[in-house]
Amino acid sequence: MAIFYKNQGFSLTTTNATTVLSINTSSVAIVKDIAVTNTGSSPATLDMYVYDYSASTTYQFIHASVQGACNGNAAQTVLNLEEGDAILAQTPIVNVIKGVISYALLDRTGENG
């Protein structure tokens, strides 16, 4: 098993829920931090979800108002993502919420069993 430490940036350019991180079906991930910033001058609501691939269900884990011109951590705890899981984000104001997800990717490609 190989462990890769990665960062995944995102910018919300639509009001629809957007996949900001997806885990392939041969890996799992441990999300350490989701840093977000609001580059606008007004507060923006941020909703974040985990899509559980094995249950075909989406769970909301963040509903927050991100103040204008500020930074913050959207992940208040570590998130464990299994094979096929994803993180989605949504905001009603486009082009102001941006972020970086820091995570460890545990790649099981080539494992026996």
Positions of predicted regions on the chain:
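A generic structural signal for short beta-strands and their flanking turns/coil linkers
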Residues: I30-K32, A44, E83-D85
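Intrinsically disordered, low-complexity Pro/Gly/Ser/Thr-rich segments with frequent PxxP/GP/PP motifs
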Residues: Y51-A86, Q90-P92
